[in-house]
Amino acid sequence: MKHYIDPETNDIYAYESDGSQDAHIKEGLVPISDEDLAAMIAPTTEQLLSQLTAARKEQEQQGVTINGIRYAGDPGNRQALKEAIEFMEDAGLTEFQKWKCSDDEFHVNHPLADVFDAYRAIGIRRVALIAAEGEYAAQITAGTLTDLSEVTWP
């Protein structure tokens, strides 16, 4: 492909390299190199940082699995886990008669210990994800990370 820009509107046009579409190239369009095109369409630092934060939150949402049961790690579920743990501890109970997990399945006589372990594991994972996000954000700000496909999460 060969690319052109309209200097008045900044619209970018692409045409076949073989010349088969040359008759459609409007007068006044300016050819641009592949390198210039890549720079023009590359996300800004702010966009990359926003995308990075969204990706970290998506990782958090996945949560953890304890004894075959998934516990989501989003803020609402973290709060629900905390409240459930506090209630059970205040009531002196060690099992939930019924527990509805993050996959919308019900579990009978679900151990409080598993919920507590999940809550703790979610917190540990969240700390690791935020640390990784910080490292990647520094690389983005420095200009050494320009493609989030290179990001791997712990």
Residue spans of the language-model regions?
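A preference for well-ordered globular domain cores
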Residues: M1-P154
